[in-house]
Design a protein with these regions (language model features):
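Short secondary-structure junction/hinge motifs that connect adjacent elements
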Residues: 22-28, 36-43
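Hydrophobic residues at beta-strand termini and immediately following loops
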Residues: 31-33, 74, 107
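Cyclic nucleotide-binding regulatory module and flanking cytosolic helices
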Residues: 1-29, 85
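Localized chelating/binding microdomains
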Residues: 15, 49, 103
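Generic structural signal for secondary-structure transition and capping sites
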Residues: 19, 29, 33, 57, ...
Length: 165
């Protein structure tokens, strides 16, 4: 097993056989990013679902005034991609950038379609993962509208102290 963090993340949601795991492990694309490297730029079409095997990614947009708006922050063991762009094959509204050296495992369209068709356990996994992503997004939207930036930062550091490492 080359990616124990990835395996554990999958096992957290589904009972994965070694055969099912290896079918995906053999097809992921490994990409290493340095601090401030872009994984995706606004206007590009997302070709991958990225799993953060190690590191930290931030999803943000820049408005017409040049102000930055952070949409999501995710770290080791999470997925962070632009699902809209990936599934619609339309340009992204967001940037995704590494905020420390980061290794991502990329799942492209062909791999996603192959594993969900030939290894049905992944349908369950991605349904659960997408549900959690949706719930997290709703929670973040609520937080953006009900808390100050300082309160959101305090919550983040309290809930994920490893971000300060």
């Amino acid at each position: 097993m080359k990616y124990p963090t990835f395996y554990k993340s999958l096992q957290d949601y589904i009972n994965l056989s070694e055969e099912d795991y290896l079918a995906l492990e053999d097809k992921v694309i490994v990409k290493r990013l340095e601090n401030r490297d872009f994984l995706l730029r606004e206007g590009q079409t997302s070709k991958y679902l990225p799993f953060i095997n190690d590191g930290l990614l931030v999803n943000y947009r820049v408005d017409e005034s040049g102000d930055y708006h952070v949409m999501q922050i995710r770290w080791t063991g999470w997925w962070l991609g632009d699902l809209f762009s990936f599934f619609s094959k339309k340009p992204s509204f967001f940037n995704i950038v590494a905020y420390k050296p980061t290794e991502v495992l990329l799942v492209n369209h062909d791999t996603f379609n192959y594993i969900t068709k030939n290894h049905p356990i992944y349908k369950k996994y991605f349904r659960i993962a997408f549900q959690k992503s949706y719930v997290g997004t709703l929670s973040q939207i609520y937080s953006l509208h009900s808390k100050t930036a300082e309160e959101r930062y305090t919550d983040l550091v309290k809930n994920v102290p490893s971000l300060l490492d």
